[in-house]
Amino acid sequence: MSDNNQCVIVGIAGASASGKSLIASTIYNELREKVGDHQIGVITEDCYYSDQSHLSMEERVKTNYDHPNALDHDLLCEHLQQLMSGNAVEVPEYSYTEHTRTSETTTLTPKKVIILEGILLLTDPRLRKLMHASVFMDTPLDICLLRRVKRDVEERGRTMDTVLKQYQETVRPMFMQFIEPSKQHADIIVPRGGKNRIAIDVLKAHIAKLLKS
């Protein structure tokens, strides 16, 4: 837990398609009614995939996106520290079709609450130290796979074959090597995915308590 009281940082980790984005958006939408639209923000770890614009498309698709080395956690840590110090940051935008950052960024101003969501957040001790609370979405892998196939085919322009190949070669092995072991660092473990109403209410109450402390 961070000792900095200027903003509350909540990290939500777990397997790909485990419900991280859903629970993050639900908490965001429900909390902003209480703390104000401009006092809560969401940062997606995917935005901090390393810039690969110097690589060919053939090289980019070979990147293991489920390994910590694929992410620029240095920049993410720097941005969180800037936000905690009261400074705005420029969050990178990432293209899933081009497999690299775009030339665009999104300005994020300091908030009372920052919700982080991403598969590998809890693997980095620097990020864990900045969090006031951490969550792990403990969704069964077979459910995650079904969701991932649907999402990647419908939203990210992938084919069924490429999604399954990536799952077998990198997604599942990296989950077992990095993501599953990081569960031990979570303050709260959420079963049954992002529609777990009890878990959402507990998280909202915990964040509200942190805001008052």
UniProtKB/Swiss-Prot annotation:
GO terms for molecular function: ATP binding; cytidine kinase activity; uridine kinase activity. Signal peptide: none annotated. Pfam families: PRK. Keywords: ATP-binding, Cytoplasm, Kinase, Nucleotide-binding, Transferase. It catalyses: uridine + ATP = UMP + ADP + H(+); cytidine + ATP = CMP + ADP + H(+). Disulfide bonds: none annotated. It comes from the Bacteria. It is found in: Cytoplasm. One of its GO terms (biological process) is CTP salvage. Pathway: Pyrimidine metabolism; CTP biosynthesis via salvage pathway; CTP from cytidine: step 1/3; Pyrimidine metabolism; UMP biosynthesis via salvage pathway; UMP from uridine: step 1/1. One of its GO terms (cellular component) is cytoplasm. ATP binds at G14, A15, S16, A17, S18, G19, K20, S21. The keyword Nucleotide-binding applies. Its main location: cytoplasm. Its EC number is 2.7.1.48. It is an enzyme of class 2 (transferase). NCBIfam families: PRK05480.1, udk. HAMAP family: Uridine_kinase. Belongs to the uridine kinase family. This is Uridine kinase. The gene is udk.
